[in-house]
């Protein structure tokens, strides 16, 4: 584990050193493209991927449901709706987008859990509740696009997901939420390990299960909302990464280690998806969210088909 983390960190360090040392002596246009286009875009994909991967892992562990993720649970759609509202109502206030996105994400997950509680708290009910809330929030987003086409003309790409045009102020505000959220998620790892023993056993060992589960869900919601603010509606990454890692490392790593790997591989997957989105049909660019949906939707169907086998 430590060797893997060291190797990833070393690779990332050498990559950024090569970028910044390569700027020395470069032409002015090249320097501007690297500094104000490529670097913010890559950093945005790294931060957003880490947040979505880690958020998906936290949700799955808190709800004991491997089908849970920010996109499936309606968190992404709720955050996206309120972030779009903030961009329309307060276009000059960057912080408003993050605050309203968090409120939208919190509203969505609250609706999902409320519906699931009323309908019978089971795995399938939680997933169906999330799909319903996602559809509701998605319809509201489409309504804004339909009724205010001129106001959202430059924001429609937000609904498809991507990092084109990302600037440093957005990165700064996202890092303010994502980095503490990642730290909080790592600190919650000990309690998540106890979740696996069952609520009664965890309670007997001194863990306040309700409070710890609430903190875990709030942390996951903050991470997902911040990721939506910089990358738009990128779905399925929080579902794919934790489940793939669980198939390889389940039972061999602690929750804190699995959380760390979910963030790292989420970053790697989103950076790779962003690269492919730019290169597959060059000079045209695919939305990153569309590319991940093409990968994630079949994976989600496969998960549903195998749920009775305990996956």
Question: Where do the language-model regions lie?
Answer:
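Alpha-helical transmembrane segments in inner-membrane proteins
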Residues: 1-311
